[in-house]
Regions:
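Accessory alpha/beta interaction modules
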Residues: 1-161, 171, 225
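Short, charged alpha-helical interaction segments and adjacent helix-coil junctions
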Residues: 2-12, 16, 20, 39, ...
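Upstream accessory/linker segments immediately N-terminal to the RecA-like ATPase cores of bacterial MutS
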Residues: 157-175, 180-187
């Protein structure tokens, strides 16, 4: 979602794939475990609640990351992300998330040989991968591991896996349980699948929860404030850039100030900063 197109979606219109609702549903441990076991084919032995929108910012001066749903047990760490709008740089995003997850573990005193198995799971409503002619590859699932190009039998064994599901290609999925889930993600219709119906009923129940409704409103008010700041910052930068370019091209200060709705003092300050 572009910050400039940000629009609050009413609680009663939320679906499982919407930001806020997705995290709320997967905060329930049994649902989260079943989703992981269905999509990753790995057993989960955690008992604690999954962490929702986990913040990882290892250094004060560095950009952190906010993970949708983060859970771990004795042997593995799993990050689950819902992607309900097109994502063109998903590969670099998984790379960044992986680095933050590892740094978070290392800074808590875990030696790197003891790093847990790591899974980054993306559930996408649209295909994130295209060929050179911009045609989607149209696979229902993409699984990435680090192997040797010269000999695929040689595994780097770094214990990291990235799994990316494309719900728009649900018809091509051979596993019926995954196909039913991807159909639900793509259409919001749970069909006859027990797990998808359970997700759908959980969404309905959460919508009636007053705490969720107030938290969702507060979250969106915060996001709206960020959007306005981004708009203001973007407009300010554009004005300053246009002022400098016009001045370089010989336009008088009076005309620049008038056309950009600036005082001469403000314009002088902009030009002084650029010199």
């Amino acid at each position: 979602m572009s910050l400039y197109n940000y629009k609050l979606k009413p609680v009663d219109e939320l679906t499982f794939t919407d930001d806020g609702m997705f995290q709320a549903v997967l905060h329930e441990p049994d649902i989260c475990a079943e989703l992981v076991e269905r999509l990753l084919h790995v057993a989960v032995d955690f008992v604690a609640y999954p962490e929702i929108e986990k913040q990882i910012a290892p250094y004060f001066s560095t950009k952190g990351v906010r993970l949708d749903v983060y859970l771990k047990d004795q042997n593995k760490i799993i990050d689950i992300e819902m992607q309900s709008y097109p994502q063109r740089s998903i590969g670099k995003r998984t790379r960044y998330y992986q680095s933050m997850i590892d740094i978070d573990a290392l800074m808590k005193g875990e030696p790197y040989p003891s790093l847990k198995d790591s899974y980054i799971l993306f559930i996408c409503k649209e295909d994130p991968f295209f060929d050179y002619d911009l045609n989607p590859y149209n696979l229902p699932c993409y699984t990435f591991r680090n192997i040797c190009e010269e000999n695929p039998d040689v595994d780097l064994n770094d214990k990291t896996v990235k799994v990316i599901y494309n719900a728009s290609a649900y018809k091509k999925e051979k596993d019926s349980s995954i196909r039913d889930f991807l159909y639900f993600i793509n259409t919001n219709d749970p069909g006859k699948d027990d797990f998808s119906n359970r997700l759908s009923e959980t969404v309905k129940r959460i919508k009636t929860n007053e705490k969720f409704r107030s938290d969702y409103a507060a979250m969106n008010l915060h996001d709206w404030d960020i959007t306005q700041l981004a708009k203001n910052d973007g407009a300010k930068e554009a004005t300053e850039r246009n002022a400098r370019n016009l001045f370089k091209n010989g336009v008088s200060k009076e005309i620049i100030a008038k056309s950009l709705n600036l005082s001469l003092e403000e314009l002088d300050e902009i030009l002084k900063e650029a010199s």
